[in-house]
């Protein structure tokens, strides 16, 4: 019986000894693994958690967080992804390789790194050094990125010839715009890929299409010393060459327009458009300083009568129908007069347009149209449309008339009607080609258009074109010497009140088409369109 008790006691003692030894082993064993610590460290880096990174590192430097902030700012890092590979151990240390993917402005930079680890108080810790960021990074160094921009592409005419130099007319230079070297402040505002001295577009097409023209820079990730001198290239991205911006400008037509404006003593502008597709062939301003051809706004005067004439033809009035053209007419309380010297009396509708009879148009507008019908015709020819030729322009504006008298005045281009050479050249182009096309100046890249093309009734278009030819052959422009086959319309637009009993000052207009070229000319304060603007059109057409 004693033996059984003894053996039981011995057995119990053995269990106690083994239990104590097992507990000591558990207390002395190193916690975790090098891979687990590396994963925690890399995860903290990815979420920009410097406190957590310190917790996984052995004696981290005081500027640990600053080192990683320098990395983010220097490279423009927006995202970090890093994952550990297979660990290896030697003695009391371990190495864990990692894969890093840093999202930079130019793309994702992929590289391989490694972390060294050792145990400290039975825990694996990262032995931090600059090599923990990148294997080629050493004390006193940092990573940065440099950019080299490609040669800037060109703004070119329809035939591919450059138009972004100083050898083109000032009107073209205004549209193309300017470039300039960035200041340090401007470069910082644009982002890390820009530096002081880089060339960027400042205005016009150069500014709007800057990214296309500039291309993308070649970027090099480099190790740099404390003075920011490059030590070694460790990564990079290939840049892309800029691409030309192609315009519809026709150099020959542009030269003809510019020459036609030479010698003018008052501000003058002209636009030429190809009727078949709405492409802008020429833009000319004299003098320079303000792009009045595209951005100016003026009452169109009697040139707008072609729009009203189309609305009247659509209402059933025929070119051969007889209309009244009194010297004066009272329409809704508004007394309408004709310009001095204009023929009056009964005449055909064609003659009323050819002679530019204000009263005939006012009376027929009152009789046959309403604000909706007149506005519909204006919209068909591009008024009130959101046009975008590829540069900043002012579209024609035709507010819907609110009274009979206002409609009568609006019908011959006064009141609140506003236009410029671009919008009236577009009207002429619509009549010449049968469709009003949203004007286009930049053809490549293609600019999205909100404006919709307006298709004219073919019979009415033909009738209106014939009526406009009568303006040149027998009407107000018969003495301008325009080439045979020209169709057009003169305009004399009041823009202020007369003083001391004198007639109000007027802008001089002429718009029309010949072949596949439509155009409009306006001379500010030029008086009568037949005497001032039509001769400019003659010089232009003769030079083509």
Predicted regions and their residues:
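Beta-lactam-recognizing serine transpeptidase/beta-lactamase-like catalytic domain environment
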Residues: 232, 268-297, 311-525, 529
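Extracytoplasmic/periplasmic proteins that interact with beta-lactams or build/remodel peptidoglycan
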Residues: 73-269, 507
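Solvent-exposed, polar/charged alpha-helical surfaces in well-ordered, non-transmembrane soluble domains
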Residues: 35-43, 47, 51, 55, ...
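Short regulatory alpha-helical segment in sensory/regulatory domains of signaling proteins that mediates
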Residues: 42-46, 72, 261-262, 382
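Short solvent-exposed beta->alpha transition segments
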Residues: 30-36, 40, 47-97
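Hydrophobic alpha-helical transmembrane signal-anchor segments
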Residues: 2-24, 91-97, 116, 123-126
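Soluble non-cytosolic domains of exported or imported proteins
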Residues: 32-36, 47-48, 59-62, 150, ...
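C-terminal region of N-terminal signal peptides and the immediate post-cleavage residues
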Residues: 4-11, 17-50, 436
């Amino acid at each position: 019986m004693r033996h059984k008790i003894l053996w039981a006691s011995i057995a119990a003692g053995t269990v106690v000894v083994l239990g104590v030894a097992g507990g000591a082993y558990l207390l002395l064993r190193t916690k975790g693994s090098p891979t687990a610590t590396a994963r925690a460290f890399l995860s903290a880096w990815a979420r920009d958690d410097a406190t957590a990174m310190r917790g996984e590192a052995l004696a981290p430097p005081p500027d640990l967080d600053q080192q990683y902030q320098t990395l983010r700012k220097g490279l423009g890092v927006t995202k970090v992804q890093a994952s550990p590979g297979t660990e290896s151990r030697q003695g009391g240390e371990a190495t864990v390789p990692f894969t890093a993917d840093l999202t930079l402005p130019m793309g994702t930079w992929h590289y391989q790194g490694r972390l060294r680890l050792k145990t400290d108080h039975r825990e694996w810790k990262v032995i931090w050094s600059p090599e923990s960021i990148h294997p080629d990074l050493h004390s006193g160094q940092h990573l940065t990125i440099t950019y080299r921009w490609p040669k800037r592409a060109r703004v070119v005419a329809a035939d591919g010839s450059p138009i972004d130099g100083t050898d083109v007319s000032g009107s073209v230079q205004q549209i193309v715009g300017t470039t300039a070297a960035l200041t340090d402040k401007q470069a910082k505002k644009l982002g890390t890929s820009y530096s002081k001295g880089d060339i960027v577009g400042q205005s016009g097409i150069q500014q709007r299409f800057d990214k296309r023209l500039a291309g993308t820079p070649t970027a090099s990730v480099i190790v740099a010393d404390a003075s920011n001198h490059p030590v070694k290239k460790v990564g990079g991205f290939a840049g892309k060459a800029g691409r030309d911006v192609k315009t519809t400008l026709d150099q020959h037509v542009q030269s003809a327009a510019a020459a036609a404006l030479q010698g003018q003593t008052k501000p003058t502008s002209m636009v030429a458009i190809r009727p078949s597709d709405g492409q802008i062939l020429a833009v000319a301003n004299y003098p320079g300083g303000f792009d009045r051809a595209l951005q100016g706004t003026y009452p169109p005067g009697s040139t707008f009568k072609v729009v009203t004439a189309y609305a009247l033809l659509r209402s059933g009035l025929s070119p051969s129908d007889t209309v009244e053209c009194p010297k004066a007419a009272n329409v809704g309380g508004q007394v309408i007069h004709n310009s001095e010297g204009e023929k009056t009396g009964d005449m055909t509708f064609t003659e009323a347009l050819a002679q530019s009879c204000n009263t005939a148009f006012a009376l027929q507008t009152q009789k046959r149209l309403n604000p909706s019908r007149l506005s519909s015709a204006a919209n068909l020819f591009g008024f009130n449309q959101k046009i975008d030729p590829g540069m900043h322009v002012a579209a024609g504006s035709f507010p819907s008339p609110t009274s009979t008298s206002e409609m009568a005045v609006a019908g011959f281009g006064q009141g609140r009607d506003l236009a410029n050479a671009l919008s009236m050249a577009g009207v002429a182009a619509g009549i010449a080609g049968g469709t009003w096309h949203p004007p286009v100046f930049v053809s490549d890249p293609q600019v999205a258009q909100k404006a919709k093309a307006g298709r004219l009734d073919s019979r009415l278009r033909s009738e209106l074109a014939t009526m406009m030819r009568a303006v040149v052959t027998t009407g107000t422009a018969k003495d301008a010497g325009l080439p045979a086959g020209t169709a057009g319309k003169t305009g004399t637009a009041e823009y202020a009140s007369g003083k001391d009993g004198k007639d109000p000052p007027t802008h001089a207009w002429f718009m029309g088409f010949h072949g596949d070229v439509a155009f409009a000319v306006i001379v500010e304060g030029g008086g009568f369109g037949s005497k001032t603007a039509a001769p400019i059109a003659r010089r232009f057409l003769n030079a083509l």
